[in-house]
Amino acid sequence: DVYKRQNKYREDVLNKKPYIDAERAVLATKAYDRYKEQPNVLKRAYMLKEILENMTIYIEDESMIAGNQASSNKDAPIFPEYTLEFVLKELDLFEKRDGDVFYITEETKEQLRSIAPFWENNNLRARAGALLPEEVSVYMETGFFGMEGKMNSGDAHLAVNYQKLLQYGLKGFEERARQAKAALDLTDPASIDKYHFYDSIFIVVDAVKTYAQRFVELAKQLAETATPERKKELLEIAEICSKVPYEPASTFAEAVQSVWFIQCILQIESNGHSLSYGRFDQYMYPYVKADLESGRETEESIVERLTNLWIKTITINKVRSQAHTFSSAGSPLYQNVTIGGQTRDKKDAVNPLSYLVLKSVAQTHLPQPNLTVRYHAGLDARFMNECIEVMKLGFGMPAFNNDEIIIPSFISKGVLEEDAYDYSAIGCVETAVPGKWGYRCTGMSYMNFPKVLLITMNDGIDPASGKRFAPSFGHFKDMKSFDELQTAWDKTLRHLTRMSVIVENSIDLSLEREVPDILCSALTDDCIGRGKHLKEGGAVYDYISGLQVGIANLSDSLAAIKKLVFEEGRLTPQELWHALETDYEGERGKEIQEMLIHDAPKYGNDDDYADSLVREAYDIYVDEIAKYPNTRYGRGPIGGIRYSGTSSISANVGQGRGTLATPDGRNAGTPLAEGCSPSHNMDQHGPTSVLKSVSKLPTDEIVGGVLLNQKVNPQTLAKEEDKLKLIALLRTFFNRLHGYHIQYNVVSRETLLDAQKHPEKHRDLIVRVAGYSAFFNVLSRATQDDIIGRTEHTL
């Protein structure tokens, strides 16, 4: 078995318990203290240099690739320059979590406590909090805007220019920066910051060279006591690491090592997530083709190296605060690999490497990387068939994004046509042009639509906290028509959207000022040309997509109110509001709840009554969010604007915890609907009706992604004819209905329930949570229950 060694490597990594690692935090503190008088770009560069030159490194016995993020595989480094607050508060709680458990030694606790005084009121969390205007304090205090993750971490959502990295090496970027620095006129005030930015690039490039050279020495040292076969391999690793990533790659092995070094180091520099591989099959294929033709590689050896790379990918880890885990359950890093789609000149982009990536991802059967296939009307039929075969393995991959809607949407927002054809997935379902896209394309305020509706109904006051969130537009109990509610919704949603923009802008400015990411900026066009890091507006394109939660709950709630209260008169506004306040308890509570659930139209059934109501309500958000530029607007990038997106990841569970009962019959504290998917078991007319309902959303304006989860029983796809039905369904959804995205959990309810009772029997069970997959056993009970509760469709 040519993959036997990689299978052992996989098992070793999966068996490793994830620990909190203080090493990076200690080294970062040392650098920040030593260079505290330096401009921030230089301080950040020296920090990365300190870490890369002194951190623990190792090469696993089974690995053909060198490079590690932490002191041991799957350990989570700490980033005190972003935050240390939640870490200190949860030091004794990491091992006691319901999900996303981390282990920690007493020595690590003491190391973290020892550096705490340096970071008190001296990191992103503190500075961002201080910058927030008083007008938005009520939303932060109550957790209405889900900014916990944003204030604790960077948020990448991009793919750097790996094609140029392989073509020119880091020395190509270094030389361009050197030329740009030499051309500066230092009498121009703007040149001073550029001068220091270019110097910071020289520092980080040198640091990466040193990091790679350390692996050269380590590989040679390990070779001295290795078996003859392993010695040969270690010496090859040493030779490769002596060349890349500083020099251009000339073989597939060099290309993989170069990409991995950068992918890993970017996640040492910043604790942002969704740092993605981009269009892997496009920029890697020339090296694969050349090596296959020369005999240097075989298809088997290429797949083995790919499986090695994907296992290395799962070694990257990130610890989040307990509050943040509610919206990012399963410790996901969202590292996306995109294959398929079309070339920049509009031809089918599927190539032999596309198939090998599919094969290798199936072989490793891991939740990372997140595999996305770009669908288009001319997609190779055999490739589509292979995608479904991999999907049938039941680990939630690949997901499909649709060129037929995404490319025109990008062009409508100002993206050049050839760049639009070159997009990739960069996290869950979000998309961007790799190597040209700004640092924060995803807003993180999580607009909770059902809660906005409750605030609207309660005259602008949040029922959960009792605090005023919006101006007074009237209480639902006093409304005489559905039009009154719609008018109040319009005004309340627009007000809260403006508030979310204030919060996001404040935190964006803090990110820009406090934690510039030098290596990431250097590898993204056109930061070097502009002399600006990403957060200053260095990228060619820069957009932010707001995220919305509970779309189906909003639809079903509006439909119930309009039909049962204002059209049929079966409920008075006072009766409905009382039922919501009491969580459907009391004299008529259960009766009213049953009425709301069973007697009103539901989103997900191709029912225009419910579908048109949510479209109308959603259009208000689309219109309002587009009015507000981001902090990079007018500073260089094309765009600088906002648009909507439904990639709510697992925030539907966390946001549901703080949302009281809603008029769709949902109980207080229970999960909201995720993405644009229907509420659990409300979609009663099969998958085609679901797809038709989703297609009625303003998909062309939801450029940030329209996330649709579906679940089917494995027996549904057991026969060849069933697979052909699914392919026909997907083609209809994408070609005729212009769907944006779809992904499947191919797993039975019975399997999931058994995994809850007997987790030891299902260690390898992987499920699609939202726009990403995770091991079922590491999820919290609430998230597991949410996945189990999803509608199971047949074809």
Identify the function of each model-found stretch.
Residues 4-198, 229-236, 244-795:
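Conserved catalytic cores of very large enzyme subunits
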Residues 181, 209, 216, 220-223, ...:
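Heptad-repeat amphipathic alpha-helical coiled-coil interaction surface used
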Residues 213, 217-220, 559, 792:
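Short amphipathic alpha-helical segments enriched in leucine
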Residues 199-211:
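Extended non-globular scaffold/tether segments
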